[in-house]
Amino acid sequence: MPVTAYVLIQTEVGKAQVAKQVGPINGVTSAENLTGPSDVIVPAEARSIDDLGRMVVSQIQLTEGITATVTCPVVNL
């Protein structure tokens, strides 16, 4: 069953281009700059929670300028 999540990203000061850098990653559906405690929000989809974790760790977190991420999987209650 596919997994959807929102990845909240904190960046270094002056790194507004992070949203443009993560946008093309396979599984990322969009990337938007924010104000507040997070700098970028990234809705993402993957085939499984494990695939989602691999995408976040091996692709999103390795993007230059990212200092922290929080991944919030969507749940159906």
Feature roles, as predicted:
Residues M1-L77:
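A compositional/biophysical signature of low hydrophobicity enriched in polar/charged and small residues
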